[in-house]
Amino acid sequence: MAALRWLSAVVAVSTTVLAITPEQMLSAPRRGEAIPNPSGNVALFSASQYSFDTKEKSSSWNLLNLKTGDITLLTDDANVSEIVWLGGDDTSLLYINGTNAEIPGGVELWVSSVKDFSKGYKAASLGASFSGLKAVRTRSGDIKFAVNAQSYANGTAYNEELATKYASTARIYDSIYVRHWDTYLTTTFNAVFAGTLKKGKHQYASAGPLKNLVAPVKNAESPYPPFGDSTDYDVSPDGKWVAFKSKAPDVPRANYTTAYIYLAPHDGSSTATPINGPDSPGTPEGVQGDANYPVFSPDSRHLAYFQMAHKSYESDRRVLYVYTLGSKTTTPAVAGDWNRSPDSAKWLDNKHLILGSEDHARVRLFGPVPIDADDDFKPQNFTDGGAVSSYHVLPDKTVLVTGTAIWTSWNVYTASPKKGVIKTIASANKIDPGLAGLGPEDISEFYYDGNWTKIQSWIIYPENFDSSKKYPLFFYIHGGPQSATPDSWSTRWNAKVFADQGYVVVAPNPTGSTGFGQELTDAIANNWGGAPYEDLVKAWEYVDKNLPYVDTENGVAAGASYGGFMINWIQGSDLGRKFKALVCHDGTFVADAKISTEELWFIEHDFNGTFWGARDNYRRWDPSAPERILQFSTPQLVIHSDQDYRLPVAEGLAMFNVLQERGVPSRFLNFPDENHWVLKQENSLVWHQQMLGWLNRYSGIEEANPDAVSLDDTIIPVVNYNP
């Protein structure tokens, strides 16, 4: 019953402010989105929790009363992987059972009820590991659903347990990608499958085999890896259509971001066709970039989606388009000049949408946005701080929001365009003992003059912060580079965990950051070590001059991905001498090694050309330049994992080699089973012990605070053959 431990915390929680440790954060419950029932009085959500004592993870599905905030357990059966409301009433459910009694490697669809979940029944047997369940109940009472799985070219779903095993482990490629994110490509690919559950007198039953809607389109794939999920496709409310996103199959996938939104009959009676392809009548002129998030209107007459204009720039501005099914005219942009890049949408009604977008280091909701809004229409925000992760429109047209913030891992509330935030229903810092005492007072922000414009930065305070005292600086640099440090919870780079070691964390959003207008985002192109570095220098100078409670003499700095590149760049720069220690996680080091990445469009955009045609651009910001290496002197921890194919592990090894040969105190931390991110809890705990232990040793935190994380907390032996 470990999964239920946190449920009792709903009743009462200590008001004592506690420092949050890495172990507390990693073992705290991780909750999913709150999904409301048709009446909007109860919501479903998933939860999982890892125990460092038992080394096991428990999972559950729960019900949240949207009026009282009370939480009750629905099921703690680990085989229940996904649940959706069946529709037609407020209690019926459809879920995926992650096992199959008849087919090894398959799953099952079950129908049940919140009244007595254990008395459900099997409605369909599926012959592979399907996931991403979406379902609508049609007027006939039948259920039209879509799921996704790996597929063979012939349309058959791939089942790993039943697949042919070759005697050789060889891989052979005639095209790129060879590998992507953390996976070597094979001849199988992701595909969306459609199916029907027929309504019988007493039960639903499968109407026949699933239809593969993607395989008939050569080289199409949906959801698109590595981050594609069920938001890459949608089922129309009338059950007649499925829309899905795929990278454009007619251009080299490693060189272009171009994507199409395809429309297919749910019954698979004809091949899917793109609504925004090069030969589609509705395609807007000059719009050739990534497209995503297709979502049908309630009346099934319109399909909203986002698309970028640039065909090889993954961080171009997204623009909302609304396609009318059956239309042969150009699909109009909606609020086309809005200087934000929305990435989610929900229909408020048949004529208006709610949009989610990054905005000034938050993720906020905007609307209502009319589908016929002119280019100069400016959507209005109606949520506050934090980061919205999902949302659903309720019957009364209020919006049920699930989000996070730097101070809470789960925050459920209602909001509306007219009233703004209405009511907080549940928040992790009020439920979980390990997060007790965290609140919005733990953070603040400031703006300062950067290299060429105003730059925003977060401040995160430690437990029992006292402005009359001094705390070492923890300077955090985000990755991307076209990304941001938002007001959101993270289990990888949790600023509050860092602060509670005894630091004041400062996290700037320099040139290249998203959510502050496209000009700031675009300005990092061919400028990696230029304006962003100067922005960071000026952030440090601002802190040194204006925040008397920050001890910059004993400050430390850390960054990941592009932030890791910047740590390596700082190591060879004057700013590097301002820090007692540095941590580089998965950062680039050798300029010429960038060609070993997988998404070539990224480097070719950010360095204004190909590796052979613009080599000087690649080398302009080279942390491994000899004159920079000669400046290396600040102790540095290098972290790099074997399954990182975005920035291969050789980059971390190269940096560590140079640091060691230069006699700079240094350590290399490697995980053979992690990618660009460290996700497994046991590995993440070691990551925190080593990262914080390294910084604490050189900042003085370890000596001043006996409870601080230490390098010695890790039981993994250190390999050291130095004479």
Swiss-Prot record:
The active site is at S561, D644, H676. Belongs to the peptidase S9C family. PANTHER family: DIPEPTIDYL-PEPTIDASE 5-RELATED, SERINE PEPTIDASE S9 FAMILY MEMBER. Residues 1-19 form the signal peptide. It is found in: Secreted. Extracellular dipeptidyl-peptidase which removes N-terminal dipeptides sequentially from polypeptides having unsubstituted N-termini. The gene is dpp5. One of its GO terms (molecular function) is serine-type endopeptidase activity. One of its GO terms (biological process) is proteolysis. SUPFAM superfamilies: alpha/beta-Hydrolases, DPP6 N-terminal domain-like. This is Probable dipeptidyl-peptidase 5. Pfam families: Peptidase_S9 (PF00326). Its main location: secreted. Transmembrane segments: none annotated. It is an enzyme of class 3 (hydrolase).
